[in-house]
């Protein structure tokens, strides 16, 4: 099987696990949360059943490309940590590096992604080379591979032949696609603005960016951050304002790698508008080699 298909299958785990009665899954990559209800546990549900569901679902849906499948579930915390750092994260980094030479201008099409509509029926991600899905797990190349595997699936081609405002990232083609895939709930979406018709969010975002009115800047909180933000809200409280497939000007969900993109909040001035991030997130962003930070921004400590 081609390695390009691995993230496609991996992201489908979200749907497969949520099809189990009494089991809830959210998140992606190495930031996932699975909840098992008391009723499911009392009915005899075991961890091994997750593996059985994944095995059967992968073999059923991807039989054209998957010849053999094996599911190994780790429950020992130390072993989970080892596998995460020695196996998973290096693989994720390699996937992200594939996009280093691609820009939004260098491709002819973008892709929609509606994998999360089970939670947010009106949410539609528009995936471009420089703006990955807000979950952080679906890049432009992943969406392309998903479309090749299943032309009628969750990732559909969006042309970009009729620009309205390229600074905002506004296209007639994108608006038409969003209207179609949101069943008419959305009419306009911009790709590079947090204030004017921002992209909607479901609940799987890696980060949330929100306007901080006193500084006229923005703060960004990542999912792992459990503290209070300068907005007086925690990440879950910000999520309640941002998710659900509703456009909320001034707030947007996004992947961590989008922060390093030149298209991040391009319409509002980009990363120089960031006034606060948790230390952990700042260190992660600093490791992204593509990020360009101007000298005035460096002096402010961003």
Label the model's feature ranges.
Residues 141-152, 241-248:
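Short metal-binding segments enriched for Cys and/or His
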Residues 1-73:
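Long, charged N-terminal interaction/targeting segments
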Residues 71-112:
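Secreted, propeptide-processed cysteine-rich mini-domains
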Residues 146-198:
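Long, charge-rich boundary regions
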Residues 109-112, 121, 131, 195-203:
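Short metal-coordination and nucleic-acid-contact micro-motifs, chiefly zinc-binding Cys/His arrays
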Residues 129-139:
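Cysteine-rich micro-motifs
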Residues 123-126, 213-237:
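Short recognition patches in nucleic-acid-associated and regulatory proteins
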Residues 291-302:
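Single conserved hydrophobic/aromatic residue that forms the stacking wall/gate
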